[in-house]
């Protein structure tokens, strides 16, 4: 077993008292009072995680699944907005091409897996098969059932290879999803988020409920468990989820070295600036 995987249950820098503090402050985000403060604290810790990942060559995969409008994109944005996209890479694959449809189902996801020193975040993943593909009839019931049998073995192989795998399902109530969908309809800046597929998923709430229940039941294992994130409160969901990620990875803080800028070179005596450059108008 890879060291990164073998150490998962050991204490790391994000200690129990930190998790308790995160949970306490998360409860206060209902009023929004401490959200910015807590998020900043968590994002600073993510920067330490990034340094550790780069130093040790760790490989991490974080899967986000969930209801439409549950806030997956919002959580992912808060994880990645203060770190390097060269280390934290977000994968949101479109519908498979005709060529990809002829490949092994997992193949296009495997191609996105991390190299040493990378964290790959899947904004929806191979779990499209027992979710949207199954409910919408894009795959047969036989293929969906077969996927549910294979997925735990596939993920066991990932972990055996040294990948740290975390799986999160963002859950939102019927009432809150309804409110968010109607908010999108009435807001020109959010209408683009409401696709025909979203509308269809709204209508098939209970079909999705059955599919997701079986998906989680069949693919929740001790090595690759599903973690449910209650998401009716977006801010609370974000800080709870980020705190859990930090508590689940056995990273250690890496000392940041202050860079020495040295002296900047002097302007050459023979340098003449190019006065023909086009400059954006100063309107503000």
Curated annotation (Swiss-Prot):
<dbReference type="InterPro" id="IPR016898">
    <property type="entry name" value="Polyphosphate_phosphotransfera"/>
</dbReference>
<keyword id="KW-0808">Transferase</keyword>
<keyword id="KW-0418">Kinase</keyword>
<keyword id="KW-0066">ATP synthesis</keyword>
<keyword id="KW-0614">Plasmid</keyword>
<feature type="region of interest" description="Disordered">
    <location>
        <begin position="260"/>
        <end position="284"/>
    </location>
</feature>
<dbReference type="InterPro" id="IPR022486">
    <property type="entry name" value="PPK2_PA0141"/>
</dbReference>
<feature type="compositionally biased region" description="Basic and acidic residues">
    <location>
        <begin position="1"/>
        <end position="22"/>
    </location>
</feature>
<feature type="region of interest" description="Disordered">
    <location>
        <begin position="1"/>
        <end position="32"/>
    </location>
</feature>
<comment type="function">
    <text>Uses inorganic polyphosphate (polyP) as a donor to convert ADP to ATP. Can also convert GDP to GTP, with lower efficiency.</text>
</comment>
<protein>
    <recommendedName>
        <fullName>ADP-polyphosphate phosphotransferase 3</fullName>
        <ecNumber>2.7.4.-</ecNumber>
    </recommendedName>
</protein>
<feature type="compositionally biased region" description="Basic and acidic residues">
    <location>
        <begin position="260"/>
        <end position="277"/>
    </location>
</feature>
<dbReference type="InterPro" id="IPR022488">
    <property type="entry name" value="PPK2-related"/>
</dbReference>
<comment type="similarity">
    <text>Belongs to the polyphosphate kinase 2 (PPK2) family. Class I subfamily.</text>
</comment>
<dbReference type="GO" id="GO:0008976">
    <property type="term" value="F:polyphosphate kinase activity"/>
</dbReference>
<dbReference type="GO" id="GO:0006754">
    <property type="term" value="P:ATP biosynthetic process"/>
</dbReference>
<dbReference type="InterPro" id="IPR027417">
    <property type="entry name" value="P-loop_NTPase"/>
</dbReference>
<dbReference type="Pfam" id="PF03976">
    <property type="entry name" value="PPK2"/>
</dbReference>
């Amino acid at each position: 077993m890879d060291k990164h995987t073998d150490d998962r249950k050991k204490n790391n820098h994000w200690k129990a008292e930190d998790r308790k503090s995160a949970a306490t402050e998360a409860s206060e985000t209902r009023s929004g009072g401490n959200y910015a403060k807590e998020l900043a604290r968590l994002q600073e810790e993510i920067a330490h995680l990034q340094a550790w990942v780069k130093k040790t060559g760790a490989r991490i995969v974080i899967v986000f699944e969930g209801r439409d409008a549950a806030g997956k994109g919002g959580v992912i944005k808060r994880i990645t907005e203060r770190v390097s996209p060269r280390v934290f890479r977000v994968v949101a694959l479109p519908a498979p091409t005709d060529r990809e449809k002829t490949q092994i189902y997992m193949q296009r996801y495997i191609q996105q897996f991390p190299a040493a020193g990378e964290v790959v975040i899947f904004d929806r993943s191979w779990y499209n098969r027992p979710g949207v593909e199954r409910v919408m009839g894009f795959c047969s019931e036989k293929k969906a059932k077969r996927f549910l049998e294979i997925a735990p073995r596939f993920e066991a192989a990932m972990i055996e290879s040294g990948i740290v795998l975390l799986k999160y399902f963002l859950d939102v109530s019927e009432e809150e999803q309804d409110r968010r969908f109607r908010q999108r309809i009435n807001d020109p800046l959010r209408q683009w988020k409401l696709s025909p597929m979203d509308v269809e998923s709204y209508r098939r709430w209970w079909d999705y409920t059955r599919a997701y229940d079986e998906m989680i039941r069949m693919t929740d294992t001790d090595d690759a468990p599903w973690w449910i994130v209650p998401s009716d409160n977006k801010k609370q969901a974000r800080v709870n989820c980020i705190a859990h990620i930090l508590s689940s990875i056995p990273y250690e803080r890496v000392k940041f070295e202050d860079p020495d800028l040295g002296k900047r070179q002097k302007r050459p005596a023979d340098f003449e600036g190019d006065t023909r450059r086009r400059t954006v108008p100063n309107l503000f």
